[in-house]
Amino acid sequence: MSKKSSVEKNEARKALVKRFAAKRKALLEIANNDALEMEERFEARLKLAELPRNSSATRIRNRCGMTGRPRAYYRKMGISRVALRELGNRGLIPGLVKSSW
């Protein structure tokens, strides 16, 4: 089980990303537009740098929905391998059977 503070910190980052997504996207489009003047593009970069660091989507960490574990995360299911194995052994995931050969 992960520390509650780590999970909460990640949730706060998700909220910030959602809040600043439109503004960040607009500034990036201006900054990467070669048709605009260099001065205007530079100002867009400065405004982008003023946004909160945690409003960038790259700072979000995928975490298990059950345990908060940050590693061995299966995107399709939203859980870690440990939780997947546990639920699979209990028969709570339809279609998942233990391999045998």
UniProtKB/Swiss-Prot annotation:
Keywords: Ribonucleoprotein, Ribosomal protein, RNA-binding, rRNA-binding. The keyword Amino-acid biosynthesis does not apply. GO terms for cellular component: cytoplasm; small ribosomal subunit. It comes from the Bacteria. Belongs to the universal ribosomal protein uS14 family. NCBIfam families: PRK08881.1. This is Small ribosomal subunit protein uS14. The gene is rpsN.
